[in-house]
Amino acid sequence: MATTSTTGSTLLQPLSNAVQLPIDQVNFVVCQLFALLAAIWFRTYLHSSKTSSFIRHVVATLLGLYLALFCFGWYALHFLVQSGISYCIMIIIGVENMHNYCFVFALGYLTVCQVTRVYIFDYGQYSADFSGPMMIITQKITSLACEIHDGMFRKDEELTSSQRDLAVRRMPSLLEYLSYNCNFMGILAGPLCSYKDYITFIEGRSYHITQSGENGKEETQYERTEPSPNTAVVQKLLVCGLSLLFHLTICTTLPVEYNIDEHFQATASWPTKIIYLYISLLAARPKYYFAWTLADAINNAAGFGFRGYDENGAARWDLISNLRIQQIEMSTSFKMFLDNWNIQTALWLKRVCYERTSFSPTIQTFILSAIWHGVYPGYYLTFLTGVLMTLAARAMRNNFRHYFIEPSQLKLFYDVITWIVTQVAISYTVVPFVLLSIKPSLTFYSSWYYCLHILGILVLLLLPVKKTQRRKNTHENIQLSQSKKFDEGENSLGQNSFSTTNNVCNQNQEIASRHSSLKQ
């Protein structure tokens, strides 16, 4: 069980005792529920049509800092220190190199805090520790630094279409910066959002319809009627309730640690081991579903997260959603799983690492992901194994998938087999992420004779490398897309995807372009 101590408030200790959950977890859930109510109040009484952006920034920031103080006590000062020093770097260093200095400092400061928490305070504990919010703030600092660098230093023709859309053309004020990093909607569990999307929301420009004018510049034509987020919020709260119920009732009866139990290893058959591995890791996911979906609901309740309308005219509130549960559980490829899990972190990795490095971007991206997650050895085992599995899965797909496209019965057979293989491979890969320590992780892999590691290496050694046209034409396509968008003056404000079109196909293309580079 997680630690029962906390650096934050002990006001809810009686409730913690009553529900038999650690006080830090109770503080987190109660503060998120408070944030949900505050979000409804924020949207109702501090709507952009009723008050100024300044007031909205101030209230969002103060509420966020209060929640941080309640949950983490004086450790919440780390949020201000990390944010404050990073802002000074942005001002002093200048736009040419600020993104590099901010990246090194923010990630370094996060790592130091993670080391002290893990090796000094509570090694191996799953608690709502103060480094959790710092992980989100680190994402925001580094993302914003890159966006400012793109908008104020690099030439437009050097940018990809997504970089141009997100580029920040002026230095944020200190209040805007702190509001972006520490607002109450995302201070505890995120998710990450782009600076432009956040400022657009605060300033009430989320529902503006824009169209290219004759002079090639965007002209606001009219303001769309603001849709209600109530249905989306209720649906997400239902998912939260089911996820929490599943976690509290099922997860404890199917511990991942049982995979390395000596008696289980000695007596269980291989089919039993495989089935239990899958079920135990399946049972470990609902706590993430709960936390991320609740965070998404909070932002939606405040009016943030609207992406546009689908083909049926229904409002889409998934601009900053962090996962798609159905796609995760039905994934038929490693890529499909990763595309739908921790989506905003995947976008961050793509934007600050994958798109900006020329040498082994896949490997460097996995390494950055491991460093960002923390200093437990299990994280590094998971992400190094993930590199191998990703490359092997890509090779298998490129060499064999085209044989199973037709007829439909063969395609169905292929989907069933790849679903089974994907779920087992994902479970096998992430066991160290849950076990954390090196010894139990290696014990697990040894009990499986490192079979998937060996199989992955053999796949890479034996299967021919089939180069796809996608990577070959990436630069060419980017330039064509940039030229077209620059000539038409599309999306110069870098707002949400719905700002330029209601066409669902175009929206899906934008989503695909944001995810595909990291996962392929």
Swiss-Prot record:
A GO cellular component annotation in the UniProt record: endoplasmic reticulum membrane
Tissue expression remark: Expressed in neutrophils.
Annotated Pfam families: MBOAT
Catalytic activity from the UniProt record: a 1-acyl-sn-glycero-3-phosphocholine + an acyl-CoA = a 1,2-diacyl-sn-glycero-3-phosphocholine + CoA; a 1-acyl-sn-glycero-3-phosphoethanolamine + an acyl-CoA = a 1,2-diacyl-sn-glycero-3-phosphoethanolamine + CoA; a 1-acyl-sn-glycero-3-phosphate + an acyl-CoA = a 1,2-diacyl-sn-glycero-3-phosphate + CoA; (9Z)-hexadecenoyl-CoA + 1-hexadecanoyl-sn-glycero-3-phosphocholine = 1-hexadecanoyl-2-(9Z-hexadecenoyl)-sn-glycero-3-phosphocholine + CoA
Cellular compartment(s): Endoplasmic reticulum membrane
Record-linked InterPro entries: LPLAT_7/PORCN-like (IPR049941), MBOAT_fam (IPR004299)
UniProt-listed Enzyme Commission number(s): 2.3.1.-, 2.3.1.51, 2.3.1.23, 2.3.1.n7
Principal cellular location given in the protein's record: endoplasmic reticulum
Annotated GO biological process: lipid modification; phosphatidylcholine acyl-chain remodeling; phosphatidylethanolamine acyl-chain remodeling; phosphatidylserine acyl-chain remodeling; phospholipid biosynthetic process; regulation of chondrocyte differentiation
Topology of this chain in the membrane: Multi-pass membrane protein
Keyword line: Acyltransferase, Endoplasmic reticulum, Lipid biosynthesis, Lipid metabolism, Membrane, Phospholipid biosynthesis, Phospholipid metabolism, Transferase, Transmembrane, Transmembrane helix
Pathway the protein contributes to: Lipid metabolism; phospholipid metabolism
Gene Ontology MF annotations: 1-acylglycerol-3-phosphate O-acyltransferase activity; 1-acylglycerophosphocholine O-acyltransferase activity; 1-acylglycerophosphoethanolamine O-acyltransferase activity; 1-acylglycerophosphoserine O-acyltransferase activity; 2-acylglycerol-3-phosphate O-acyltransferase activity; acyltransferase activity
Transmembrane annotation, as ranges: 22-42, 61-81, 88-108, 184-204, 237-257, 264-284, 366-386, 416-436, 444-464
Modes of activity regulation: Partially inhibited by thimerosal.
Active-site residues, record numbering mapped to chain: 342, 373
Top EC group: transferase
Family: Belongs to the membrane-bound acyltransferase family.
Function: Acyltransferase which catalyzes the transfer of an acyl group from an acyl-CoA to a lysophospholipid leading to the production of a phospholipid and participates in the reacylation step of the phospholipid remodeling pathway also known as the Lands cycle. Catalyzes preferentially the acylation of lysophosphatidylethanolamine (1-acyl-sn-glycero-3-phosphoethanolamine or LPE) and lysophosphatidic acid (LPA) and to a lesser extend lysophosphatidylcholine (LPC) and lysophosphatidylserine (LPS). Prefers oleoyl-CoA as the acyl donor. May be involved in chondrocyte differentiation.
Name recorded for this polypeptide: Membrane-bound glycerophospholipid O-acyltransferase 2
Organism of derivation: Homo sapiens
